[in-house]
Amino acid sequence: MKLTIIGGGPGGYTAAFAAAKAGVEVTLVERAHLGGTCLHTGCIPTKTLRSSADVLEMSGRLAEFGITGECALKADMPAIVNRKRKVTATLQTGLEKTCAQLKVRVVYGKAELVSAKLVRVTTAEGTEEVESDNVIIATGSSPLELPSLPVDHARVLSSDDALELQAVPSSLIIVGGGVIGCELAFIYRAFGSKVTVVE
């Protein structure tokens, strides 16, 4: 049996690993990097930034724990972002190794579903057609842009942009009080921004 999976995020690679362990011949098609939104612009990067924010926030409460002295700690954004990149790179390498161990064939490119059993993949080298008995579509998500507030990646940022800032903004307005918005609000407030959340 052959299976093609479109999307190498948590849904896609989990399905690929389970199918491969069951003896299925798996082709996993990924447009960019294994790990998807969760690994590259979601759960893992935000938790990594948040751990830095937690440490910085805790440092302001040292006296509560009987630790005194003078210290002026601040967020070093290039170092924080570099740490985040190392964490995601390490986890991505782990996924690549697991694919190799389980003999999951990974094809990097843009997938097009031609029929229920045929996927056309446009890669840097050209076009490849992958035929299989079944296809799983696990294509993930991307940040929503509001027509009234276009992202310019300078003053108006996407949540992805907020994970790569090289300096702490003096103030920040976050549109959206969901999980991502509130998490970014906590992170940047801990780093020293004056944060307003609009919901």
Predicted regions and their residues:
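Conserved acidic residues
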Residues: G9, K110-E112, G178
